[in-house]
Design a protein with these regions (language model features):
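Short aromatic/hydrophobic "clamp" motif used to bind/position activated sugar donors
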Residues: 103
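Short, acidic, metal-binding catalytic loop of nucleotide-sugar glycosyltransferases
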Residues: 24-35
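A recurrent flexible, glycine/aromatic-enriched loop bordering the glycosyltransferase active site
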Residues: 164-184
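C-terminal catalytic/acceptor-binding lobe
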Residues: 200-325
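Acidic donor-binding/catalytic loop of UDP-sugar-dependent glycosyltransferases
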Residues: 108-123
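Short beta-strand/loop segment that forms part of the nucleotide-sugar
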Residues: 34-45, 64-70
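Short beta-strand-to-loop element that shapes/binds the nucleotide-sugar donor at the catalytic cleft/hinge
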Residues: 130-150
């Protein structure tokens, strides 16, 4: 089988991610014999769920259902007492398995709107880094991949929307790479060691990635036609994944920041972990990762055991024992 041109990474840790919506919406947009694979990275992986995802795909595109790679924050190898948010690790799992030269990440609980795939194809053809637009709505009814009815919600408006242009992608800065779908050449992502798992348990992994890509010389685009609509109800259902954002006294914060080689704080605000994520990447001006105990380009599933043995027992920010989280 020939390698695909685009790998779509769909990561989820939900009992009900709404994959049928995404599968139907994507299939409606694909041309015949589209060179695409969809990789479902599943934090709840089991054989029964594989059958369910395969049934939703219904043979309309190549599908692979894979377990999320081990993480100190989520899954069977976790060091924490409960599952935490670990989107960076899940997306890096997709990069381990992706076979295409271009990778697009799509959030669960969402349906791609009619121009989404065309925007992905355009970005892939030009080798561009692109952020798609999103909206979050309630009371969604999706029929065969088409959003039939929904209710708009002020909390679900993409803050970049007015920056966009319906006719073409526009340039944005690295810190504006976030949201429900974004894409980039796989080799570019591997060259900066993927997403930084320093962000796991906290968040900001997409914004931090955008800043690091910009430091690596990439141009970041925003394509308003690459739109997905996310269900507020599905997104809030089930057991929430823990997110933490601990604070330190100012002096301790600045001492910890200096450990990363940053002596002047670039941001203002609370002295918490989420600010330090940004302070480190902005203060160093580097694309380097600080939370990945491996080099992603060399990582294969057979090497996960060595990675697990290097997992930390404490949180990088404040030294808190992960077992107490």
């Amino acid at each position: 089988m020939s390698a695909p041109r685009v790998s779509v990474v769909y990561a989820t840790a939900r009992d009900e991610p709404g994959f049928r919506w995404f599968a139907d919406g994507l299939a409606r947009q694909l041309p015949d014999r589209a060179d695409v694979e969809v990789i479902v990275v599943d934090g709840r992986f089991d054989a029964g769920r594989s059958a369910r995802f395969e049934a939703d795909a219904a043979g309309r595109f190549a599908l692979r259902h894979v377990a999320a790679k081990p993480s100190p924050y989520q899954g069977p190898y976790r060091r924490t007492s409960r599952d935490c948010f670990a989107a960076a690790s899940a997306r890096n799992t997709g990069l381990v398995h992706a076979r295409a030269p271009y990778v697009v990440f799509a959030d669960d609980c969402s349906v791609p709107m009619p121009r989404w795939w065309r925007a992905v194809e355009r970005a892939a053809a030009h080798g561009e880094v692109v952020a798609g637009a999103y909206q979050k709505r309630s009371a969604m009814r999706v029929d065969d991949g088409v959003l039939a009815t929904s209710r708009a919600d002020d909390s679900g408006i993409d803050g970049r929307w007015t920056l966009g242009d319906d006719g073409r992608p526009v340039r944005i800065h690295g810190g504006q790479l976030y949201g429900a779908s974004f894409g980039a050449p796989r080799e570019l992502l591997l060259s900066i060691n993927g997403l930084d798992e320093q962000c796991d348990s906290i968040g900001y992994e997409d914004v931090q990635l955008g800043l690091r890509l910009a430091h690596a010389g990439a141009t970041i685009l925003y394509d308003r036609s690459m739109l997905t609509i996310e269900s507020l109800e599905l997104g809030s259902a089930g057991l929430p994944l823990l997110r933490v954002d601990p604070e330190l006294p100012e002096r301790e914060y600045r001492e910890r920041l200096a450990d990363f080689g940053v002596t002047r704080r670039p941001t203002q605000g609370r002295f918490d972990a989420s600010h330090m994520i940004l302070d480190v990447v902005l203060g160093t001006g580097s694309w380097a990762t600080h939370g990945n105990c491996y080099w992603l380009a060399d990582l294969v599933p057979d090497g996960y055991g060595d990675m697990v043995r290097r997992f930390p027992d404490t949180h990088w920010f404040d030294g808190c024992l992960l077992s107490t989280m």
